[in-house]
Amino acid sequence: MSDSKVNMVSPPEGLTGEGFFATKLNDVVGLARANSLWPLPFATSCCGIEFMATMAAHYDLARFGSERVSFSPRQADMLLVMGTISKKMAPILRQVYEQMSEPRWVIAVGACASSGGVFDTYSVLQGIDKVIPVDVYVPGCPPRPEQIVDGVMRLQELVKSESVRRRSSPEYQELLASYNIS
């Protein structure tokens, strides 16, 4: 075995002392994105009431970086779809999703958004993943605020580990193409 010697490089002049570390750009960007998600609530039913409780002082979703709830798709990067989505509402949901800028993430909150819930009828969309890609599913009818917080935390983990280049990858473009989203 050879003795390898590590060459320590001295920092540039004026940049000495504590507080410097080396990391990857993906990690820094992922950490920043994960802790500054701006939610856009798309609520149609009782899950929206649970989301209101989640944003209130007792559960305080703001402590996870979702301080500012946006009601403009152009200023949001996390779409929370809550409640029953009718088939007539599906094109509107898709339009809202398309108006969001990249990177954008989707959480399906509750049984109705995830799978249509108990409403297995001709007029109800059986899961929003039929019209837009979903990143995290939160189960429940309606889910408790703790479950919604857990869903946001799971999304944060996904965002932290996502590569900066993922959104321009052929796989991601293929996923969007499968939904006819350009």
Swiss-Prot record:
InterPro entries: NADH_UbQ_OxRdtase-like_20kDa, NADH_UQ_OxRdtase_20Kd_su. Belongs to the complex I 20 kDa subunit family. The gene is nuoB. Its EC number is 7.1.1.-. SUPFAM superfamilies: HydA/Nqo6-like. Its cofactor is [4Fe-4S] cluster. It comes from Flavobacterium johnsoniae (strain ATCC 17061 / DSM 2064 / JCM 8514 / BCRC 14874 / CCUG 350202 / NBRC 14942 / NCIMB 11054 / UW101) (Cytophaga johnsonae). GO terms for molecular function: 4 iron, 4 sulfur cluster binding; iron ion binding; NADH dehydrogenase (ubiquinone) activity; NADH:ubiquinone reductase (non-electrogenic) activity; quinone binding. One of its GO terms (biological process) is aerobic respiration. This is NADH-quinone oxidoreductase subunit B. It catalyses: a quinone + NADH + 5 H(+)(in) = a quinol + NAD(+) + 4 H(+)(out). NDH-1 shuttles electrons from NADH, via FMN and iron-sulfur (Fe-S) centers, to quinones in the respiratory chain. The immediate electron acceptor for the enzyme in this species is believed to be a menaquinone. Couples the redox reaction to proton translocation (for every two electrons transferred, four hydrogen ions are translocated across the cytoplasmic membrane), and thus conserves the redox energy in a proton gradient. Signal peptide: none annotated. NDH-1 is composed of 14 different subunits. Subunits NuoB, C, D, E, F, and G constitute the peripheral sector of the complex. It is a peripheral membrane protein. PROSITE patterns: COMPLEX1_20K.
